[in-house]
From Swiss-Prot:
NCBIfam families: rpoC2_cyan. Pfam families: RNA_pol_Rpb1_4, RNA_pol_Rpb1_5. Zn(2+) binds at C220, C291, C298, C301. This is DNA-directed RNA polymerase subunit beta''. Its EC number is 2.7.7.6. The gene is rpoC2. It comes from Ranunculus macranthus.
Length: 1383
């Protein structure tokens, strides 16, 4: 040893890693014995110092970091903004999760970095600081949890809980934080126990597989090797050195013509350094993979022993060492897990900040727009980008590395220290990336819409899985789906309006509907047209048969009309819609009275048409049957003018006016079945109640069955009643189909009591000779005075000169003897009381045949009234119908001109005329104040509106502020038809006031802007086809509702721009659409009115390309249904507790990623591809070789990755020995001609090759990957197998097969108490082995062929190496060229 004076003196703190280096160098220089002596001295020194220091730890030593408060606040602020963006639909769930993780992770990391300087400055001798930062006890992560913040936790699956724990353990946790903390830490505590046993079991299995592998020869004579090349940057230098040191070269290595190293030379540090400096050609090394021996290994293929730096000794049990070296770190590391307590760890990106204030410039051609991982718009640069920032007095140049995100636009002004770019963190080999599926579930019930085209996923062409081609929103439009089990089909046609109480809504949704609606949300009348407009790309489809949607949050599907105290049912049939009225009080008193007002779609009433009708519940039946008027003749053809037209599609049928006191109804049960259905009862048989008729239909009454076939259907009727077999003299026998009214029977007969209701006699002849009489019960309906409908329309006291009259008429809806069919669960209305409209003809003879009716809504401050308005007026607008017009009649000015002619009262003279001419009627529909329901009649002469004067002053000021450009013009009288003031673009919005007193208000104040704007009368007309006549004076367009632009008039002042709103448009949260400020909820515009919108609330979900959408467009989703599935990459938690299962999965050859294919499947694919390329016999042999080599390298890399991520160094050799055992078997396939092995038998690869050589014919086999468990059960020794698992089965099989155990392994010998063939016990075997010569046989046909294939078809060979192996980027042996395949 050198003198002390010559030694270098280091004055440094030595930590763990420095200590490791020191020891390794000491061993290199001085050898083992001397090193141990030095280490003893170090140990003694350490213990002395620790004793004198005597560190103790108290709670006061935990000092919280001062900057923590504002850091946490800042992070909370960012999370809040993020949450908002998510609600607005700007970021999707995965982006939100990622970003919240990164926000909190960055905060936590920053606190962690602050910790050390903080301790150093405030209290350097703090025991916590000394202990943790010296590496003696505890680490930074634990101290950080004590004094910083606990941060994000991962749940037991290694997923992230996105609620961070902001407190540290010194401050104490809140209840929620404590629970989350336990949830995460449970993994630490419980799993440490569980995983320790796991790790032990893993070690046991590993040792089991390789226990028989012992070094038994010096050289096996193989010429194969695996080439490792340092040239490509995939392998880091450190890994490269680790791979090479201790190996043996498989081939001579030349540098130019000079040989640097020869075959079979072992590689030391010096040689490796020369390789790195020279960067010569790929280096071929021997590995356990290439060793030719079947069940052992040779010294040269193994290399140097890990214990001393020389070649491994003969007789060394390298298998057991390998198993232990892989299993042991697992046990160690599981014990080490609890220190983090489940705290999540991940990586963040670096940022580039602006050096100074100024304008930023870069070349826009070199970047292209993209979206960052957090959903922000950014530019991605492919190459180095030079960015200049023009400061106030200096130009700054910043270089941005390739693949970075630029977060600002070109020419944007940036502030100093603003983040301008984000450098992508290099995908380090330490964290795993795995592709995960994340399902997004719906928060609410509703109907699904998406705003872009979607593709069907190819494998689900007929399913409901769609792929998104571009980023777009999915919308869930709110609505309560109705789950109806009873109705097999819906009564409601597409686009019908449905009442909440409608018949098919069997469950009562009424209870949980809060029909709270504010006034501006009252839904306007909008009846969509029948045909969908295909051209514009809108298809309004009906979402299934029995789904009825209704919802209480004022979001009515298909804009059903609702108000606070009435449910209006608007059913739109082909040519009319009806609105039944009902008020709250009425609801409580009696079942729903169906007073309905009918208005034809074109809004035109003829004389004597029905205005309203009432369906009396007393005349309602639940069963099918026949109406009879009895013996009384019915005048079905009444006087011409009394005949009421009732049009239906094409069929014209009169309603039978009722002039009789009573009529009869004969009930019967009818089932109409498809022709193919099997009926379980016979014709003319008699059945009881609840008899099964078909598979799923049961009868509701008992009686006689009649079955008739009609076209393709079967009509099955069940008649209830009594059966008589009359004698021949009995008079009843001659009659069939006679109705006997009550009291007509003989007084003395027994039946007289039964005849109270009357009977119906029907003769039935089942066969020619037999007949009997069926006596059926009859229900009698007496004529009742229907509710006096006219009373519901009280005459207004001011309306003495009203010219509209109403009559009440009762109608029977079905003819004499007409069968009535009941369509699933509806009621049949037999009698309808109708209100017929009539009006006086004008005295001058200008007869008005049609009256136009429409709805008007009038506001009185906060009160809203709806009216039916009838105008006895011929408007200056005619209805035209174009042939190809899909929507129907539209409003078009008579002469097509846009402006002046539409104004009928341009001069004062015309105003007077129009007042006389335009008399009309308005009747209210709803009355909120009175208990009785009244419809007030108003005529145009006494209905006018007043503007609120108090707001005028305010607007006056407004105008003064705007430079007095518009001084208020003089007020002038204006009255339009029906007293409606034309609303010209004015400075304020109207409030409507209704007055019944003509004298009170004669003048209407209105800003006279007629001369300045185009003088067009501003009608607001929606005709019931959904056509709109646009009330904006400057634009006269006819818009159909599907692309319905509405110009929102901002009444405050004219300079303000107006938003364009389309019907059906979707709004995200917080979009400004009105002057009152941003709209707070997201939704879809349902109805647009002059001064209000109705928005159906909806929730947007953002989805990016490649996401999978579940469900169809317009499908009804329930809460918690899966909406979208995102596939995204996430870095796996670097905790070994998650790592160990990964190791185990690889070794057991189970699938690893949740998405990537199984390793086994991959091997199959390989086999097929190569066989296809090379033809059968060669294909099998080479295929098996290549497949096995390929999968071996992949497996080694996968396992190394887990351990390296934990900073554990395991030499590749150990893993290779294990992997060699997993992959050393092949499966004999049926294609072989030889009878040596049976198909499906597992044999060793080398054995298969040798047998093939001996037989001189090819054995066909393919590679399989066995897991370690299967490999342990497929060894050559049945004793070893039996001692591992399934003892009885293994021994029984071995006995039946007559297997022989050659006792080559360790375990068999231990079990039988023999000498184990390793170490000294091995020496006895050596003399037996020395006779075996290593001479190489002469090359036979196969080898020559093999060499030819591999060397003369280089490109073919390359094409076989797959490009799609998952880990190729980080593969250690990136070139897997086998230098030679010949032996």
């Amino acid at each position: 040893m050198a003198e002390r004076a010559d030694l270098v003196f280091h004055n440094k703190a030595i930590d763990g890693t420095a200590m490791k280096r020191l020891i390794s160098r000491l061993i290199d220089h001085f050898g083992m014995a001397y090193t141990s002596h030095i280490l003893d001295q170090v140990k003694t020194l350490g213990f002395q110092q620790a004793t004198t220091t005597s560190i103790s730890l108290g709670i006061d030593d935990l000092l919280t970091i001062p900057s923590k408060g504002w850091l946490v606040q800042d992070a909370e602020q960012q999370s809040l903004i993020l949450e908002k963006h998510h609600n607005y639909g700007n970021v999707h769930a995965v982006e939100k999760l990622r970003q919240s993780i990164e926000i909190w992770y960055a905060t936590s990391e920053y606190l962690r970095q602050e910790m050390n300087p903080n301790f150093r400055m405030t209290d350097p001798s703090n025991p916590v600081h000394i202990m943790s930062f010296s590496g003696a006890r505890g680490n930074a992560s634990q101290v950080h949890q004590l004094v910083g913040m606990r941060g994000l936790m991962s749940d037991p699956q290694g997923q992230m809980i996105d609620l961070p724990i902001q407190s540290n353990l010194r401050e104490g946790l809140s209840l929620t934080e404590y629970i989350i903390s336990c949830y995460g830490a449970r993994k630490g505590v419980v799993d440490t126990a569980v995983r320790t046993s796991d790790a032990g079991y893993l070690t046991r299995r590993l040792v089991e597989v390789v226990q028989h592998i012992v070094v038994r020869r010096t050289d096996c004579g193989t010429t194969r090797g695996i080439s490792v090349s340092p040239r490509n940057g995939m392998i880091t230098e450190r890994i490269f050195i680790q791979t090479l040191i201790g190996r043996v070269l498989a081939d001579d290595l030349y540098m130019g013509s000079r040989c640097i190293a020869i075959r079979n030379q072992d590689i030391g540090v010096g040689l490796v350094n020369r390789f790195i400096t020279f960067r010569s050609q790929p280096i071929s090394i021997r590995t356990p993979f290439t060793c030719r021996s079947t069940s052992w290994i040779c010294r040269l293929c193994y290399g140097r022993s890990p214990t001393h730096g020389d070649l491994v000794e003969l007789g060394e049990a390298v298998g057991i060492i390998a198993g232990q070296s892989i299993g042991e770190p697992g046990t160690q590391l599981t014990l080490r897990t609890f220190h983090t307590g489940g705290v999540f760890t991940g990586g963040t990106a670096e940022h580039v900040r602006a050096p100074d204030n100024g304008k930023i410039k870069f070349n826009e051609g070199l970047v292209y727009p993209t979206r960052t991982r957090h959903g922000y718009p950014a530019f991605l640069c492919y190459i180095d980008l030079s960015v200049t920032i023009e400061g106030p007095d200096i130009l700054h140049n910043v270089n941005i590395p390739p693949k970075s995100f630029i977060l600002v636009k070109n020419d944007q002004y940036v502030e100093s220290e603003q983040v301008i770019a984000e450098i992508r963190a290099e995908a380090s080999t330490l964290n795993f990336k795995e592709r995960v599926r994340k399902h997004i579930y719906s928060d609410s019930e509703g109907e699904m819409h998406w705003s872009t085209a979607v593709y069907h996923a190819p494998e689900y062409t007929y399913g409901n899985v769609h792929l998104l081609p571009k980023t777009s929103h999915l919308w869930i439009l709110s609505g309560v789906p109705q789950r109806s089990s009873i109705v097999p089909f819906s009564l409601h046609k597409d686009q019908d309006q449905i009442n909440i109480h409608s018949l098919s809504a069997k469950q009562k949704f009424i209870s949980n509907l809060s029909l709270s609606m504010t006034n501006d949300q009252v839904i306007k009348k909008l009846f969509r047209s029948d045909s969908s407009v295909k051209k514009g790309g809108w298809v309004l489809d009906y979402s299934g048969p029995a789904e009825v949607l209704c919802n209480g949050h004022c979001n009515l599907i298909y804009s059903a009309i609702l108000d606070e105290n009435s449910d209006l049912l608007a059913k739109r049939r082909r040519n009319r819609f009806t609105i039944p009225l009902q008020s709250n009080q009425e609801k409580e008193q009696k079942p729903r009275s169906g007073i309905s007002i009918e208005i034809p779609i074109n809004g035109l009433f003829r004389i004597n048409s029905i205005l309203a009708y009432f369906e009396d519940p007393r005349y309602r039946r639940k069963s099918s049957g026949i109406t009879k008027y009895g013996t009384i003749e019915v005048d079905s053809i009444v006087k011409k003018e009394d005949l009421i037209e009732y049009r239906r599609t094409k069929e014209f049928r009169p309603k039978y006016q009722m002039k009789i006191d009573r009529f009869f109804f004969i009930p019967e049960e009818v089932h109409i079945l498809p022709g193919s259905s099997s009926i379980m009862i016979r014709n003319n048989s008699i059945i009881g109640v609840d008899t099964r008729i078909t598979f799923n239909i049961r009868s509701q009454v008992g009686g006689l069955v009649r079955v008739e076939k009609k076209k393709k259907k079967i009509e099955l009727k069940i008649f209830s009643g009594n059966i008589y077999f009359p004698g021949e003299t009995d008079p009843i026998s001659w009659h069939s189909g006679i109705l006997i009214p009550p009291g007509a029977g003989k007084k003395n007969s027994k039946e007289s009591k039964k005849l109270k209701n009357g009977i119906y006699v029907q003769r039935i002849t089942p066969t020619k000779k037999k007949y009997f009489v069926l006596v059926r019960p009859v229900v009698t309906y007496e004529r009742a005075d229907g509710i006096n409908l006219a009373a519901l329309f009280p005459q207004d006291p001011l309306q003495e000169r009203d010219n509209v009259q109403l009559r009440v008429v009762n109608y029977i809806l079905y003819g004499n003897g007409k069968p009535i069919r009941r369509i699933s669960h509806t009621n049949i209305q037999l009698v309808r009381t109708c209100l017929v409209l009539n009006w006086d003809q004008d005295k001058k003879g200008s007869s008005i045949e049609e009256v136009r009716a429409s709805f008007v809504e009038i506001k009185i401050n906060a009160l809203i009234r709806d009216f039916i308005k009838m105008d006895l007026v011929k408007y200056p607008i005619s209805y035209t119908r174009k042939r190809n017009d899909p929507v129907g009649s539209g409003l078009i000015p008579v002469n097509g001109s846009d402006h002046t002619n539409l104004n009928p009262f341009y001069s004062k003279a015309s105003i007077k005329q129009s007042l006389i001419r335009h008399q009309g009627t308005i009747r209210t529909l709803l009355n909120k104040n009175k208990e009785c329901q009244s419809l007030i009649t108003l005529s145009s002469s006494n209905c006018s509106r007043i503007d609120p004067f108090n707001r005028l002053k305010y607007h006056n000021n407004m105008i003064k502020k705007s430079n007095k450009r518009d001084i208020l013009p003089p007020i002038r009288n204006l009255l339009g038809p029906l007293g409606i003031i034309p609303k010209i673009t004015n400075f304020f919005s109207f409030y409507y006031l209704i007055t019944h007193n003509q004298i009170l208000v004669k003048k209407n104040s209105q800003l006279d802007n007629l001369k300045r704007t185009s003088p067009v009368l501003k009608y607001y007309l929606i005709d019931e086809n959904g056509r709109i006549f646009n009330p904006d004076p400057s634009i006269n367009m006819i818009l159909n509702p599907f692309n319905w632009n509405w110009y929102f008039i901002h009444h405050d002042y004219c300079e303000e721009t107006s938003t364009i709103i389309n019907l059906g448009q979707f709004f995200c949260e917080n979009v400004c659409i009105s002057k009152s400020g941003p709209h707070l909820k997201s939704g879809q515009v349902l109805i647009v009115d002059v001064d209000s919108l109705v928005i159906r609330s909806a929730k947007p979900y953002l989805a990016t390309p490649g996401a999978t959408v579940h469900g169809h467009y317009g499908e009804i989703l329930y809460e918690g249904d899966t909406l979208v599935t995102f596939i995204y990459e996430k870095s796996r938690s670097g905790d070994i507790t998650q790592g160990l299962p990964k190791v185990e999965q690889v070794l057991e050859v189970r699938s690893i990623d949740s998405i990537s294919m199984n390793l086994e499947n991959r091997v199959e694919g390989w086999n097929e591809r190569i066989t296809r390329t090379l033809g059968i016999p060669w294909g099998f042999l080479i295929g098996a070789e290549l497949t096995i080599a390929q999968s071996r390298i992949s497996l080694v890399n996968k396992i190394q990755k887990v351990y390296r991520s934990q900073g554990v160094q395991i030499h590749n050799r150990h893993i290779e020995i294990i992997v060699r055992q997993i992959t050393s078997k092949v499966l004999v396939s049926e294609d072989g001609m030889s009878n040596v092995f049976s198909p499906g038998e597992l044999i060793g690869l080398l054995r298969a090759e040798r047998t093939g050589r001996a037989l001189e014919e090819a054995i066909c086999y393919r590679a399989v990957l066995l897991g370690i468990t299967r490999a342990s059960l497929n060894t050559q020794s049945f004793i070893s197998e039996a001692s591992f698992q399934e003892t009885a089965r293994v021994l029984a099989k071995a006995a039946l097969r007559g297997r022989i155990d050659w006792l080559k392994g360790l375990k068999e010998n231990v079990v039988l108490g023999g000498m184990i063939p390793v170490g000294t016990g091995f020496k006895g075997l050596v003399h037996r082995l020395s006779n075996i010569s290593l001479e190489i046989e002469k090359k036979n046909l196969f080898k020559g062929g093999m060499r030819d294939i591999l060397f003369h078809h280089k490109e073919l060979f390359d094409s076989c190496i797959p490009r799609n192996f998952p880990d190729t980027s980080e593969q250690l042996f990136t070139k897997q060229s086998f230098t030679r395949f010949t032996d």
